[in-house]
């Protein structure tokens, strides 16, 4: 992480905040921002789990991103669904087995998104926003449908009301 973000161990020693203080500032910032939809690339299975674990360890409420009017989504699943329903929404590299690859650092450049250092915080944000814009533009129905299912209760209402609905999972 230090290498990817071009930092040094020295910055860890000279930080003005403890881990707990940093997380407190983070939580206070989220509260100050108010209700939001949090979307990342592969964020549900990685970032959200890491965040919840960190919040729990610091005695903070671990479900900040999915309660009190906040919702969350994952652009990885959305990218896969967009290409399923609107083929060629995104350009993907192909694996040796002939499968589309959905790694952010590989699909971003193929789709004209120059995002600097892959896996750096700002680089991944730039790439994620770029991919989101492409999906919004080229597969707007998939984008709109995904926004209806970022909240558990709203999703349950859709399931109860609709005669048919579709969900996509990838393994």
Which residues are covered by each model-predicted region?
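Short linear motifs at secondary-structure transitions and domain/linker junctions
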Residues: 13-16, 48-52, 161
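Acidic two-metal-ion nuclease catalytic site recognized across multiple nuclease folds
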Residues: 133-171
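Metal-dependent phosphoesterase core characteristic of DEDDh/y 3'-5' exonuclease domains
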Residues: 1-9, 29-142, 146
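Generic hydrophobic alpha-helical segments
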Residues: 22-30
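Metal-dependent phosphoesterase signature
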Residues: 4-23
């Amino acid at each position: 992480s230090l290498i990817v973000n071009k930092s040094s161990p020295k910055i860890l020693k000279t930080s003005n905040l403890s881990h707990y203080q940093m997380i407190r500032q983070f939580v206070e910032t989220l509260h100050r921002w108010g209700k939001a939809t949090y979307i990342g690339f592969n964020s549900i299975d990685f970032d959200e789990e890491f965040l919840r674990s960190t919040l729990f360890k610091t005695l903070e409420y671990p479900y900040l991103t999915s309660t009190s009017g906040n919702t969350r989504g994952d652009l990885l699943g959305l990218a896969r669904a967009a290409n399923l329903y609107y083929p060629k929404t995104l350009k993907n590299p192909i694996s040796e087995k002939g499968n589309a690859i959905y790694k952010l650092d590989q699909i971003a450049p193929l789709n004209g998104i120059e995002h600097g250092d892959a896996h750096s915080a700002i680089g991944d944000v730039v790439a994620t926003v770029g991919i989101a814009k492409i999906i919004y533009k080229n597969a707007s129905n998939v984008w709109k449908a995904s926004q209806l299912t970022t909240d558990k209760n709203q999703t349950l209402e859709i399931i109860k009301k609709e005669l048919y609905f579709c969900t996509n999972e990838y393994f």
